[in-house]
Curated annotation (Swiss-Prot):
Name assigned to this protein: Probable ATP-dependent RNA helicase DDX6
Motif interval(s): Q motif: 85-113
Lineage: Eukaryota, Metazoa, Chordata, Craniata, Vertebrata
Motif (DEAD box): 235-238
SUPFAM superfamilies associated with the record: P-loop containing nucleoside triphosphate hydrolases
Class of the enzyme per the UniProt entry, highest EC level: hydrolase
Origin species: Cavia porcellus (Guinea pig)
Domain Helicase C-terminal: 297-457
Gene: DDX6
Length: 472
């Protein structure tokens, strides 16, 4: 069939998903816009360039903004159930506000309303909120507001569990701060040349966004000087404080000034997080926006299959679904590559990504999928933490997870920021007890898949109801 495999990208004769119309892919104009945005390579230091437009007191500065197209898709109460605050209410720098609005962030989400004013006071925060409800903005906005750009030292650190999430947060940070002339952001993660990072730290860096092992290595070598760090953020704190990372995080905290501010953000808070909080946070402000664990906009189904029927089931689903982009999860790296190959042989364009791939290949797949160059991505749980790709409206668990926490993070890749999404689970005989257990633990209902799935459940254009208005 003439398949080619290159760096996690499998290409065969491409069939459009979703039947007639191709399933609502991004327009060429949108793709070109995405391609033109800055790409943050691992360890790359970027300076937010100030714009040539001079903002004078009294100017109607909002008229100078280059706003993205307004997102008219329906949003659920996960992000619209707010107090009615505006970003201007927080007395933020005008240059920061410009970056916020040019990101398309019109009003603060519930987690942003709760977090931003408290974080600006310097108080520690323990925040629990659903995936895809604006946590990155909740900590990046106060972080950038509190920077003193006259100083040339590291003032804030954001620690994340995966390399891909570090690159994503770096991109957001740079875009939001682009009007703050001189704000310098550096991403540093494992899997890249340590010497390059050492050289970049010779220059001014204000914000470091890193994975735990790499930043601790740089601190121990005396290259990353953290004695002036005033804020550290642990994004996906439950993972960072799991057995894999907790000792590294303890070592990092010990290198920081005693009066630093600590912000913890996660969807789940196990005992390890509580223990860390008791040891290191000082009278933290606690935020809990998790009345229910799963996103309101994600509809969940299961299909009973045998192991041999799984690929056939996918082949049946693809033409019936109105897929914009989909993420398909497997439980091992080997199964990821095998499934990606089979999907390509069926005639569907497919990328794959897992932790055993070389970092530059992972970066390329992540970048290209995010930019809409492929509709389907097969991956391991590497892609469950914080990764935000707004175009994803379908998640398929080809292999059903054993843990409720893993399931929660997987299906949270769709339905981002209050939008609609669909999660389909292929359940074998051996999975049936896990299915029941996860339903009970999350307090959610996973329904049998119907013969025809109502497109209004996961495709915004088919939704008959008007977009929910924010509360006045």
């Amino acid at each position: 069939m003439g398949l080619s495999s290159q760096n996690g990208q499998l290409r065969g004769p491409v069939k459009p998903s979703g039947g007639p119309g191709g399933g609502g892919t991004q327009t060429q104009q949108q793709m070109n816009q995405l391609k033109n945005t800055n790409t943050i390579n691992n360890g790359t230091q970027q300076q937010a360039q100030s714009m040539t437009t001079t903002i004078k007191p009294g100017d109607d500065w909002k008229k100078t903004l280059k706003l993205p197209p307004k997102d008219l898709r329906i949003k659920t109460s996960d992000v619209t159930s707010t107090k009615g605050n505006e970003f201007e209410d927080y007395c933020l720098k005008r240059e920061l506000l410009m970056g916020i609005f040019e990101m398309g962030w019109e009003k603060p989400s519930p987690i942003q309303e709760e977090s931003i004013p408290i974080a600006l006071t310097g108080r520690d925060i323990l925040a629990r909120a659903k995936n895809g409800t604006g946590k990155s903005g909740a900590y990046l906005i106060p972080l950038l507001e509190r920077l003193d750009l006259k100083k040339d030292n590291i003032q804030a650190m954001v620690i994340v569990p995966t390399r891909e999430l570090a690159l994503q947060v770096s991109q957001i940070c740079i875009q939001v701060s682009k009007h703050m002339g001189g704000a310098k952001v550096m991403a540093t993660t494992g899997g890249t040349n340590l010497r390059d990072d050492i050289m970049r730290l010779d220059d001014t860096v204000h914000v470091v966004i890193a994975t735990p092992g790499r930043i601790l290595d740089l601190i121990k070598k005396g290259v990353a000087k953290v004695d002036h760090v005033q804020m550290i953020v642990l994004d996906e704190a439950d993972k960072l404080l799991s057995q894999d990372f907790v000792q590294i995080m303890e070592d990092i905290i010990l290198t920081l000034p005693k009066n630093r501010q600590i912000l913890l953000y996660s969807a789940t808070f196990p005992l390890s997080v509580q223990k860390f909080m008791n040891s290191h946070l000082q009278k933290p402000y606690e935020i809990n926006l998790m009345e229910e664990l799963t996103l309101k906009g994600v509809t969940q189904y299961y299909a009973y299959v045998t192991e041999r029927q799984k690929v056939h089931c996918l082949n049946t689903l693809f033409p019936r679904l109105q897929t914009n982009q989909s993420i398909i999860f497997c439980n091992s790296s080997q199964r990821v590559e095998l499934l990606a190959k089979k999907i390509s042989q069926l005639g569907y364009s497919c990328f794959y990504i897992h932790a055993k791939m070389r970092q530059e290949h992972r970066n390329r797949v992540f970048h290209d999928f995010r930019n809409g160059l492929c509709r389907n991505l097969v991956c391991t749980d590497l892609f469950t933490r914080g990764i935000d790709i707004q175009a994803v409206n379908v998640v398929i668990n080809f292999d059903f997870p054993k843990l409720a926490e893993t399931y929660l993070h997987r299906i949270g890749r769709s339905g981002r920021f209050g939008h609609l999404g669909l999660a389909i689970n292929l359940i074998t005989y051996d999975d049936r007890f896990n299915l029941k257990s996860i339903e009970e633990q999350l307090g959610t209902e996973i329904k049998p898949i119907p013969s025809n799935i109502d497109k209004s459940l996961y495709v915004a254009e088919y939704h008959s109801e008007p977009v929910e208005d924010e509360k006045p």
